[in-house]
Amino acid sequence: MPIRCDMMAIAAGAFLSLQPAWADSAAQPLPPVDAGSRMMAIGPENGDLAKRVGAWTVTETVWDAPGAPPKVTKGLIAERRMVGSMIQEILRDPADAKNTVLRMDYLSFNRVEGRWEYVSMDTRAAVGIMTAQSIGRGRAAQIEVVFQPFALPGAGQDVSGQMLRMREEIINVAADHDVKDQYFTLADGTGAEWLAHRYDYVLR
């Protein structure tokens, strides 16, 4: 019996001697996360974008001028995927055997600046790389970005270099339905804005 008591006392002493080490370990604060790492996290705004990935059927409508009749192209396919915190969209015509990229864009919320950033490239028009930003945070269900002014080559054989302003509204109509509207304003002295381009997306 005395031997058993001695063994219990030794075990209890060992337990108590280890307890402060456990307590000290539990009390150690987690290492601080630097600002860059925090801002690289996807965040709620880009988390909403991640819900829009997948394949979408697109109807494209173009109005060349205010009051012009619409030109409609149906059955295009947009493929969306996340690239880091950005959503990438690639537009193709499934009837094209070469699977040519018609248009590509990227959209992301810049958590440092607190605004949306957007870039697009259209292989069907001589407009180069177009960049746009929002004024502020806005709403995830309706994002508005304003493009840097750019020039159209103009009609006919001679390059006229018609300057153009453009803003774009990206509207989440429903979980399976998006609309992207582009409004043009020509630098022609009228200041008239019109809906020039619409992409209507339905999730496949």
Task: Locate predicted features.
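Edge beta-strand at a domain terminus
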Residues: 27-31, 177, 183-204
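Boundary at the C-terminal end of the N-terminal hydrophobic targeting segment
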Residues: 21-27
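Bacterial N-terminal signal peptides
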Residues: 9-19
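N-terminal helix-cap/turn-to-beta initiation motif at the start of protein domains
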Residues: 40-57
